[in-house]
Amino acid sequence: MFSSATTEEGGFEASSNSIIDNDYKSYGLELESSYDVSEDLNFRGGFTYTKAEITSGANDGNQPRRQPKLMYNFIPTYKFSQSKNTLGLSFIGQTKAYAQDNNDLVMNGFVIVNAFVEVGITKGLSVNVSGNNLFDTLAITESEEGNITDNAVNYVRARPMPGRSISMALSYKF
């Protein structure tokens, strides 16, 4: 569990050419766990729940920018053929968050699904195939502008998670 109250002295934000001068309070819970169902099957996961609020200024009562209420991960893995090989998935996600402290523009929540398989070829030699963001999910984690103006050209700079990728690696351990 955590709790915090922060007084921000005012920082310059170059992208919006403005001074950020907000006070904040937050509390929440973070939990991680791992469970071996059997010698071959394992579940790992974690989540962070955060209740955060701006407590001063023009945005008093709003949720701070880029702060989802819930972030989570879940990673099942399975070893097969005498534990020489491993198959796994990971689910990484978060709920919606706001682009700016005014809470006008929402960045949608998302779940990114990854998978991997590692196969032992010989003693010390293995091949790993990984797929990241298998469903090519658009996951925005950060954005600069917070308003969309009617009857105007609007530009919003955003930082997405990488799209789908597949990779293969050959490893030798000696």
Q: Can you say where each PLM-predicted feature lies in the sequence?
A:
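Transmembrane beta-barrel architecture of outer membranes
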Residues: 26-28, 69-73, 110-114, 155, ...
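Active-site lining segments that contact anionic ligands and/or coordinate catalytic metals
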Residues: 84-86, 110-112, 124, 163
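C-terminal beta-signal and adjacent terminal beta-strands/loops
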Residues: 96-97, 119-174
